[in-house]
Amino acid sequence: MKRLRVPCSLFCPYRQMRKILVLLSFFTVLAATAQDIPPRKQQKLSRWHIPPANYSGITWLGEDRYAVVSDKDSLDGWYEFRIQLDPAKGRVKQAERLAFHGMHTGAPVRDAEGIAYSPERNTLFIAAESDQRVLEFSDSGQLTGRELQLPAKLSLDSIYGNYGLESLTYNSHTHTFWTVTEHSLKADGEKSTARNKVPCKLRLLAFGDDLKLKGEYHYETDVPQARKENSRYAFGVSALTALDDGSLLVLEREFYVARKFMSSWVRCKIYRVFPAAQETPLKKEFMYSFTTNLNLTRRNLANYEGMCLGPVLDDGSRALLLLSDSQGGFGNSTYHLRDYIRVLRLSGF
């Protein structure tokens, strides 16, 4: 009779357990890496009776105060928000939209997309798409006459339609402003679409407290993932957040709107880059991603355009707030977009 050779591992509990422990350790390391920014469910702003708007940028003013811009307002300025976080759970406990601070600056709609707070001067800077400028405002919402000295290559003629300045952030430790266009400049490459599958080639621009350009770094997005062409489509970088160590968090956002709205989706990815490394393009460190949808089973579609740091939470992590743009509650008889806020945790920063 031929003797069957049975693997020893089936009868060696110690050896088998050791293999299992090694595998578990490996996957634990992977999980820890992927969860540097643990997921948190998004919350509707309407639960606190905050009216829908076109919220496109957010910055922290300290404690529970934030400044938020809306890109369809006739006045140029920002809304003051009070957002109270649960320091243990990292969720929003209470939110309130307070006064609007702003003024007429000449344009019917300046299309404010990004906002940053400078605590040293107690002023706010607002980046707008309609004029491709970043203007400084006092804390009462009046122009100071100062602005970031953007290079001529970022002029209105250099951008694709509705793909101009989108992001703005400032870090008081590095004394640096950062801004970037949502999409490639015309001179830097063709428009990224679902058909050509090319990445956006972007220029991350750094400015000092003197508002002068002090650095330019090349950043490439992932390629579009949409499979179909559609006129209602947005792809590129929608927000930046500058960290104390000189690195940047970059929010890549792809928004696909189906022809009859059902089956629309938004995919967001957060990467970290280190401009000081001087790579071309900058090497990206993946941090976190999520997708929201409008379909038969999920109706949480959210177009995230704002991102900023918040306070330190009880576990020592730092709150990272994301804010979505509902296009003023855009929709039809069966569904309307909602404004959402999402809080993530940054650990080890």
Residue ranges and their predicted role:
Residues 1-38:
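Bacterial Sec-dependent N-terminal signal peptides
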Residues 35-349:
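Sequence/structural signature of beta-propeller domains
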